Amino acid sequence: LSTLLLSGEKAMDEDAGNEHIVVVPRLGTISSWSSKATDIAHACGLEEIDRIERGICFSYLAPMDLNNELFNQIKMAIHDRMTESVLDKDFDLQNLFLQQQPEKLNEIELVTQGKQALEIANSELGLALSDDEIDYLCNHYERMQRNPTDAELMMFAQANSEHCRHKIFNADWVIDGKPQSEKLFSMIKSTTEASPKGVISAYSDNAAVIEGFEIDRLMSSTADREFVFTKEPTHIVMKVETHNHPTAISPFAGAATGAGGEIRDEGATGLGAKPKAGLTGFSVSHLRIPDYPQPWESDFSHPDRMASPLEIMTDGPIGSAAFNNEFGRPNLLGYFRTYESSLPDLPVNEIRGYHKPIMIAGGVGNVRDQHALKIDVPEDAEIIVIGGPAMLIGLGGGAASSLDSGSSSEDLDFASVQRGNPEMERRAQEVIDRCTSLGDKNPILLIHDIGAGGLSNAIPEAVDHSKHGALLELREVDNAEPGMSPMGIWCNEAQERYVLVINKERRQEFITICERER
């Protein structure tokens, strides 16, 4: 273990300063570095290790005791408050690895306390429920004569959020007193309806598919375990989405997981596809580069809880590129623009800009002809989650991204940001590739990626498609945090995970593929 951890550049002399500050990943979270390092240790045979975590010890010379103001300035300069914690001098490092007992399912006392209990839960859990939705839930549970659980409310909030339902784009519009026949989404879809030639699927799967070409595909042969070229029709997968809220809170992690989520959407198209190349785009407010003022930049205020435009453009593109590179997909193109302007002609002077940025992640891939479309799922099929473990990160991300910026607490904002582990996503993609290489014997009957809302969104999507019910065992979900409540397991947005449905008879065959790819 010492050889593994002490390789590379040596640390400076610990006695170089008379004061020390230790910075670690934010308490209560598991960093992606920790997940990777622990996994590498296990792969090297060090099975006794439960978890490895990394911190940085900063040494500095201080001629006198620093007052709190100066000490806080030093702390702010050396750590990212959204992703890291500064430890007190008397902090016991063993507490980094404390494992809590599993939390219980909580009920919201709607029966005894009425609507107010739901309004409090809406605020405390960051559910972003509207007044109409709160009234709807109150009436629903009153008819059932029982209290809602926190897992049910969080699930409803994610699945019914603007992020997942696109309520604005699906809303009816009245312009100048005249109801409009088209909705925004139907207007977007009308182009495909008017020109359907070459479109295999659009607006019905995790990504769109258009007709491709006959090409040589390099795939592994299960029989002799050799890679062979096979000439066959191969179609083009296309996807673009945004990841704005997480990028505003933590630019590197937000942009990285934005790219990772788009990659998973491509891989989870049809019965399994292969991501090939990516794009990234950013729209932010003016950069205000220190000591490099520009005539069009005014000193407008900026929300403290959000990263500055300069921080976003310093860390965000690197986060996206890093995930693409570590996954093994080139990020080939993108765009970048700034915009911020005063609108003095309005009754109240307004300033418009991208304090909450636009972060676009997109890409193209390919899919075999026989796997381009989803199929019907038989009864008694098994639902399986593959990829990384459940972790208490990204909780409530779908609802958080639907809130007006600044209307939730800083802790809720942070909780809604995911953390990326591209190596794990690569492994999961290798499982998909091995399955699709089997052609007509592909064991995958249905596949969805796990994104906003976690399992609470992805599994109901799969169950709804199957037209059957499902029996779920939450405690059997791979979980890195044993203290997580049922709501946490059901709704967390830990990354690099997919929901698959496979034939029960082929379970062991599928597990063998997963074990080979670790």
Regions found by a protein language model. Give the residues of each.
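A structural signal for short secondary-structure junctions
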Residues: 492-494
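Conserved beta-strand-centric core segments of catalytic alpha/beta enzyme folds
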Residues: 497-498
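Anionic-ligand anchoring segments at beta-strand to alpha-helix junctions in alpha/beta enzyme folds, i.e.
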Residues: 465-486
